[in-house]
Amino acid sequence: MTDLTATPAPAEPAASAYDPTAKQKAQAKTARIPIKIVPIEKLKKPEWIRVKAATSSSRFNEIKTILREHNLHTVCEEASCPNIGECFGKGTATFMIMGDKCTRRCPFCDVGHGRPDPLDADEPKNLARTIAALKLKYVVITSVDRDDLRDGGAGHFVECIREVREQSPATRIEILTPDFRGRLDRALAILNAAPPDVMNHNLETVPRLYKEARPGSDYAHSLKLLKDFKALHPDVATKSGLMVGLGETTDEILQVMRDLRAHDVDMLTIGQYLQPSEHHLPVREYVHPDTFKMYEEEAYKMGFTHAAVGAMVRSSYHADLQAHGAGVV
Protein backbone atom coordinates (compact mmCIF):
# COMPACT_ATOMS: atom_id res chain seq x y z
CA MET A 1 0.00 0.00 0.00
CA THR A 2 1.24 3.45 -0.90
CA ASP A 3 2.00 5.68 2.07
CA LEU A 4 0.15 8.93 1.35
CA THR A 5 1.47 10.68 4.42
CA ALA A 6 3.06 13.96 3.31
CA THR A 7 6.75 14.19 3.91
CA PRO A 8 7.44 17.29 5.99
CA ALA A 9 9.26 19.97 4.03
CA PRO A 10 12.75 20.75 5.23
CA ALA A 11 12.67 23.38 7.92
CA GLU A 12 13.48 26.89 6.73
CA PRO A 13 16.74 28.12 8.19
CA ALA A 14 16.05 30.51 10.99
CA ALA A 15 16.48 34.16 10.02
CA SER A 16 19.63 35.51 11.49
CA ALA A 17 18.91 37.63 14.51
CA TYR A 18 19.40 41.37 14.16
CA ASP A 19 22.73 42.32 15.71
CA PRO A 20 22.80 46.04 16.54
CA THR A 21 26.54 45.89 17.23
CA ALA A 22 27.39 44.69 13.71
CA LYS A 23 28.44 47.24 11.10
CA GLN A 24 25.65 47.46 8.53
CA LYS A 25 26.41 48.59 4.99
CA ALA A 26 24.30 49.12 1.85
CA GLN A 27 20.95 47.28 2.05
CA ALA A 28 21.40 46.21 5.67
CA LYS A 29 21.80 49.87 6.58
CA THR A 30 19.16 51.53 4.42
CA ALA A 31 16.41 48.90 4.81
CA ARG A 32 15.31 50.37 8.15
CA ILE A 33 15.02 54.05 7.22
CA PRO A 34 11.45 55.47 7.28
CA ILE A 35 11.36 56.65 3.65
CA LYS A 36 12.09 53.75 1.33
CA ILE A 37 14.46 54.13 -1.60
CA VAL A 38 12.66 53.75 -4.91
CA PRO A 39 15.04 52.62 -7.65
CA ILE A 40 15.05 54.55 -10.92
CA GLU A 41 16.72 53.90 -14.24
CA LYS A 42 20.43 54.39 -13.75
CA LEU A 43 21.80 57.47 -15.49
CA LYS A 44 24.86 57.12 -17.67
CA LYS A 45 27.87 58.91 -16.24
CA PRO A 46 28.91 61.85 -18.42
CA GLU A 47 32.46 62.34 -19.63
CA TRP A 48 33.22 65.00 -17.01
CA ILE A 49 32.90 62.45 -14.18
CA ARG A 50 36.44 61.13 -14.07
CA VAL A 51 38.27 59.63 -11.09
CA LYS A 52 42.05 59.92 -10.84
CA ALA A 53 43.72 56.63 -9.90
CA ALA A 54 46.82 56.41 -7.74
CA THR A 55 50.05 56.22 -9.72
CA SER A 56 52.70 53.56 -9.21
CA SER A 57 55.00 56.17 -7.63
CA SER A 58 52.37 57.46 -5.20
CA ARG A 59 52.15 57.01 -1.42
CA PHE A 60 48.85 55.10 -1.64
CA ASN A 61 50.06 51.80 -0.16
CA GLU A 62 52.29 53.54 2.38
CA ILE A 63 49.34 55.55 3.72
CA LYS A 64 47.10 52.46 3.98
CA THR A 65 49.83 50.52 5.80
CA ILE A 66 50.42 53.30 8.35
CA LEU A 67 46.69 53.68 8.98
CA ARG A 68 46.30 49.97 9.72
CA GLU A 69 49.38 49.93 11.95
CA HIS A 70 47.86 52.68 14.10
CA ASN A 71 44.32 51.23 14.05
CA LEU A 72 42.92 54.35 12.39
CA HIS A 73 40.02 54.86 10.00
CA THR A 74 39.63 57.36 7.19
CA VAL A 75 36.39 58.68 5.75
CA CYS A 76 38.12 58.25 2.39
CA GLU A 77 37.86 54.46 2.80
CA GLU A 78 34.68 54.15 4.89
CA ALA A 79 32.60 56.45 2.65
CA SER A 80 34.07 55.03 -0.58
CA CYS A 81 35.28 58.45 -1.70
CA PRO A 82 36.06 58.52 -5.44
CA ASN A 83 39.13 60.68 -4.84
CA ILE A 84 40.90 58.21 -2.54
CA GLY A 85 43.54 57.25 -5.10
CA GLU A 86 44.53 60.85 -5.75
CA CYS A 87 44.50 61.95 -2.11
CA PHE A 88 46.31 58.92 -0.67
CA GLY A 89 48.72 59.16 -3.58
CA LYS A 90 49.63 62.70 -2.50
CA GLY A 91 49.98 61.69 1.15
CA THR A 92 46.75 63.27 2.41
CA ALA A 93 43.82 61.70 4.21
CA THR A 94 40.77 62.70 6.21
CA PHE A 95 40.91 60.86 9.52
CA MET A 96 37.66 59.48 10.94
CA ILE A 97 37.65 59.21 14.71
CA MET A 98 35.35 57.49 17.21
CA GLY A 99 35.04 54.25 15.25
CA ASP A 100 33.55 53.18 11.94
CA LYS A 101 29.90 52.67 13.00
CA CYS A 102 27.55 55.64 12.75
CA THR A 103 24.37 56.01 14.80
CA ARG A 104 22.56 57.52 11.79
CA ARG A 105 21.41 55.83 8.56
CA CYS A 106 21.77 58.56 5.93
CA PRO A 107 21.01 56.80 2.62
CA PHE A 108 23.47 58.86 0.56
CA CYS A 109 26.42 57.85 2.72
CA ASP A 110 28.44 54.63 2.59
CA VAL A 111 29.74 54.77 6.17
CA GLY A 112 28.42 51.77 8.12
CA HIS A 113 25.64 51.97 10.71
CA GLY A 114 25.51 50.14 14.03
CA ARG A 115 25.84 50.43 17.77
CA PRO A 116 29.25 52.08 18.18
CA ASP A 117 32.06 50.59 20.22
CA PRO A 118 33.33 52.43 23.31
CA LEU A 119 35.72 55.27 22.58
CA ASP A 120 39.35 54.28 22.19
CA ALA A 121 41.29 56.24 24.81
CA ASP A 122 44.50 55.74 22.82
CA GLU A 123 43.08 57.12 19.58
CA PRO A 124 44.12 60.78 20.09
CA LYS A 125 47.76 59.78 20.66
CA ASN A 126 47.70 57.26 17.79
CA LEU A 127 46.23 59.89 15.50
CA ALA A 128 48.84 62.46 16.49
CA ARG A 129 51.69 59.97 16.02
CA THR A 130 50.41 59.09 12.56
CA ILE A 131 50.12 62.72 11.49
CA ALA A 132 53.63 63.39 12.77
CA ALA A 133 55.00 60.31 10.99
CA LEU A 134 53.41 61.42 7.72
CA LYS A 135 54.68 64.99 8.23
CA LEU A 136 51.29 66.42 7.34
CA LYS A 137 50.97 70.20 7.42
CA TYR A 138 47.18 70.26 7.12
CA VAL A 139 44.79 67.61 8.41
CA VAL A 140 41.05 67.08 8.43
CA ILE A 141 39.54 65.18 11.36
CA THR A 142 35.96 63.99 11.04
CA SER A 143 33.81 61.44 12.84
CA VAL A 144 30.77 59.25 12.66
CA ASP A 145 27.66 60.53 14.44
CA ARG A 146 27.79 59.47 18.09
CA ASP A 147 24.27 60.08 19.38
CA ASP A 148 25.10 57.62 22.16
CA LEU A 149 27.52 60.06 23.83
CA ARG A 150 26.37 62.85 26.14
CA ASP A 151 28.58 65.38 24.36
CA GLY A 152 28.19 63.88 20.88
CA GLY A 153 31.92 63.24 20.86
CA ALA A 154 33.02 66.87 21.26
CA GLY A 155 35.40 65.96 24.09
CA HIS A 156 37.12 63.36 21.91
CA PHE A 157 37.57 65.96 19.16
CA VAL A 158 39.25 68.24 21.71
CA GLU A 159 41.60 65.48 22.89
CA CYS A 160 42.60 64.76 19.29
CA ILE A 161 43.22 68.44 18.53
CA ARG A 162 45.36 68.81 21.66
CA GLU A 163 47.47 65.73 20.90
CA VAL A 164 48.04 66.75 17.28
CA ARG A 165 49.10 70.25 18.31
CA GLU A 166 51.43 68.82 20.93
CA GLN A 167 53.24 66.57 18.44
CA SER A 168 52.90 68.75 15.31
CA PRO A 169 52.59 72.39 16.42
CA ALA A 170 52.82 73.76 12.87
CA THR A 171 50.04 71.56 11.51
CA ARG A 172 46.74 73.26 10.75
CA ILE A 173 43.63 71.35 11.84
CA GLU A 174 40.19 71.33 10.23
CA ILE A 175 37.40 69.41 11.92
CA LEU A 176 34.33 68.16 10.05
CA THR A 177 31.77 67.54 12.77
CA PRO A 178 28.39 65.84 13.14
CA ASP A 179 25.48 68.06 14.14
CA PHE A 180 25.60 67.41 17.92
CA ARG A 181 21.80 67.43 17.83
CA GLY A 182 20.27 67.54 21.30
CA ARG A 183 23.58 68.49 22.90
CA LEU A 184 24.75 71.52 20.90
CA ASP A 185 25.39 73.92 23.78
CA ARG A 186 27.37 71.31 25.68
CA ALA A 187 29.42 70.42 22.60
CA LEU A 188 30.24 74.05 21.76
CA ALA A 189 31.29 74.73 25.35
CA ILE A 190 33.66 71.75 25.21
CA LEU A 191 35.11 72.79 21.83
CA ASN A 192 36.00 76.16 23.39
CA ALA A 193 38.89 74.40 25.12
CA ALA A 194 40.70 73.73 21.83
CA PRO A 195 39.04 75.26 18.77
CA PRO A 196 40.28 74.10 15.36
CA ASP A 197 41.74 76.27 12.61
CA VAL A 198 38.70 75.55 10.41
CA MET A 199 35.26 74.46 11.62
CA ASN A 200 33.37 72.44 9.01
CA HIS A 201 29.85 71.05 9.21
CA ASN A 202 28.07 69.96 6.04
CA LEU A 203 24.46 70.83 5.28
CA GLU A 204 24.68 68.17 2.53
CA THR A 205 21.44 69.04 0.71
CA VAL A 206 18.48 71.41 0.51
CA PRO A 207 15.88 71.46 3.31
CA ARG A 208 13.14 69.90 1.14
CA LEU A 209 15.20 66.71 0.83
CA TYR A 210 16.25 66.39 4.49
CA LYS A 211 13.65 63.81 5.50
CA GLU A 212 14.71 61.60 2.59
CA ALA A 213 18.47 62.19 2.63
CA ARG A 214 19.30 63.07 6.24
CA PRO A 215 16.85 61.28 8.57
CA GLY A 216 17.56 62.34 12.13
CA SER A 217 19.04 65.70 11.11
CA ASP A 218 17.54 69.18 10.98
CA TYR A 219 18.44 71.95 8.52
CA ALA A 220 17.85 74.85 10.92
CA HIS A 221 19.83 73.12 13.66
CA SER A 222 22.84 72.62 11.38
CA LEU A 223 22.78 76.31 10.42
CA LYS A 224 22.58 77.23 14.11
CA LEU A 225 25.62 75.08 14.89
CA LEU A 226 27.70 76.99 12.34
CA LYS A 227 26.45 80.41 13.41
CA ASP A 228 26.83 79.76 17.14
CA PHE A 229 30.38 78.47 16.69
CA LYS A 230 31.30 81.53 14.64
CA ALA A 231 29.87 83.83 17.31
CA LEU A 232 32.15 82.19 19.87
CA HIS A 233 35.19 82.13 17.57
CA PRO A 234 34.97 84.99 15.05
CA ASP A 235 38.58 84.46 13.95
CA VAL A 236 38.08 80.77 13.03
CA ALA A 237 36.92 80.09 9.46
CA THR A 238 33.64 78.20 9.14
CA LYS A 239 32.84 75.93 6.22
CA SER A 240 30.02 73.81 4.84
CA GLY A 241 29.42 71.50 1.90
CA LEU A 242 26.59 70.47 -0.41
CA MET A 243 25.90 67.61 -2.81
CA VAL A 244 23.98 68.13 -6.03
CA GLY A 245 22.15 65.60 -8.17
CA LEU A 246 19.65 64.36 -5.57
CA GLY A 247 16.66 66.11 -7.13
CA GLU A 248 17.19 69.64 -5.84
CA THR A 249 16.64 72.71 -8.03
CA THR A 250 19.16 75.41 -8.88
CA ASP A 251 17.11 77.98 -6.97
CA GLU A 252 17.13 75.75 -3.89
CA ILE A 253 20.93 75.48 -3.95
CA LEU A 254 21.29 79.25 -4.33
CA GLN A 255 18.94 79.76 -1.37
CA VAL A 256 21.01 77.38 0.79
CA MET A 257 24.10 79.38 -0.16
CA ARG A 258 22.35 82.57 0.94
CA ASP A 259 21.32 80.87 4.19
CA LEU A 260 24.94 79.90 4.84
CA ARG A 261 26.16 83.46 4.36
CA ALA A 262 23.35 84.73 6.60
CA HIS A 263 24.75 82.39 9.26
CA ASP A 264 28.30 83.73 8.84
CA VAL A 265 29.77 80.74 7.00
CA ASP A 266 33.00 81.64 5.19
CA MET A 267 33.87 78.69 2.94
CA LEU A 268 31.80 76.49 0.64
CA THR A 269 32.16 73.19 -1.22
CA ILE A 270 29.72 71.82 -3.80
CA GLY A 271 30.18 68.48 -5.56
CA GLN A 272 28.26 65.88 -7.54
CA TYR A 273 26.51 63.13 -5.57
CA LEU A 274 27.58 59.66 -6.71
CA GLN A 275 25.56 56.61 -5.61
CA PRO A 276 27.72 54.24 -3.51
CA SER A 277 25.50 51.22 -4.30
CA GLU A 278 22.09 50.34 -5.74
CA HIS A 279 20.74 50.40 -2.17
CA HIS A 280 21.56 54.10 -1.72
CA LEU A 281 19.69 57.13 -3.02
CA PRO A 282 19.80 57.25 -6.82
CA VAL A 283 21.51 59.98 -8.81
CA ARG A 284 18.69 62.01 -10.36
CA GLU A 285 20.91 64.37 -12.34
CA TYR A 286 24.53 64.79 -13.36
CA VAL A 287 24.98 68.52 -13.01
CA HIS A 288 26.71 70.18 -15.96
CA PRO A 289 30.08 71.92 -15.45
CA ASP A 290 28.50 75.21 -16.56
CA THR A 291 26.11 75.02 -13.60
CA PHE A 292 28.99 74.36 -11.21
CA LYS A 293 30.75 77.40 -12.66
CA MET A 294 27.64 79.49 -12.06
CA TYR A 295 27.46 78.32 -8.43
CA GLU A 296 31.12 79.25 -7.94
CA GLU A 297 30.62 82.73 -9.39
CA GLU A 298 27.52 83.30 -7.27
CA ALA A 299 29.36 82.11 -4.15
CA TYR A 300 32.01 84.79 -4.50
CA LYS A 301 29.36 87.42 -5.22
CA MET A 302 27.66 86.42 -1.96
CA GLY A 303 30.90 86.94 -0.04
CA PHE A 304 32.29 83.45 0.58
CA THR A 305 36.06 83.72 1.11
CA HIS A 306 36.60 80.49 -0.82
CA ALA A 307 34.37 78.24 -2.92
CA ALA A 308 35.50 74.82 -4.19
CA VAL A 309 32.85 73.85 -6.72
CA GLY A 310 32.95 71.03 -9.25
CA ALA A 311 31.75 67.52 -10.01
CA MET A 312 34.52 65.71 -8.12
CA VAL A 313 34.82 68.20 -5.26
CA ARG A 314 34.27 66.75 -1.80
CA SER A 315 34.26 68.55 1.54
CA SER A 316 37.82 67.51 2.37
CA TYR A 317 39.18 67.33 -1.19
CA HIS A 318 42.28 69.56 -1.40
CA ALA A 319 41.20 71.01 1.95
CA ASP A 320 44.66 72.51 2.42
CA LEU A 321 44.34 74.44 -0.84
CA GLN A 322 40.82 75.52 0.11
CA ALA A 323 42.09 76.85 3.43
CA HIS A 324 45.01 78.59 1.73
CA GLY A 325 42.59 80.22 -0.71
CA ALA A 326 40.55 81.49 2.22
CA GLY A 327 43.64 82.90 3.92
CA VAL A 328 43.71 80.34 6.74
CA VAL A 329 47.19 78.94 5.95
From Swiss-Prot:
It is found in: Cytoplasm. [4Fe-4S] cluster 2 binds at residues 102, 106, 109. Its EC number is 2.8.1.8. SUPFAM superfamilies: Radical SAM enzymes. GO terms for molecular function: 4 iron, 4 sulfur cluster binding; lipoate synthase activity; metal ion binding. It catalyses: [[Fe-S] cluster scaffold protein carrying a second [4Fe-4S](2+) cluster] + N(6)-octanoyl-L-lysyl-[protein] + 2 oxidized [2Fe-2S]-[ferredoxin] + 2 S-adenosyl-L-methionine + 4 H(+) = [[Fe-S] cluster scaffold protein] + N(6)-[(R)-dihydrolipoyl]-L-lysyl-[protein] + 4 Fe(3+) + 2 hydrogen sulfide + 2 5'-deoxyadenosine + 2 L-methionine + 2 reduced [2Fe-2S]-[ferredoxin]. InterPro entries: Aldolase_TIM, Elp3/MiaA/NifB-like_rSAM, LIAS_N, Lipoyl_synth, rSAM. [4Fe-4S] cluster 1 binds at residues 76, 81, 87, 316. Its cofactor is [4Fe-4S] cluster. Pathway: Protein modification; protein lipoylation via endogenous pathway; protein N(6)-(lipoyl)lysine from octanoyl-[acyl-carrier-protein]: step 2/2. Residues 1-23 are annotated as: Disordered. NCBIfam families: lipA, PRK05481.1, PRK12928.1. This is Lipoyl synthase. It comes from Burkholderia mallei (strain ATCC 23344).
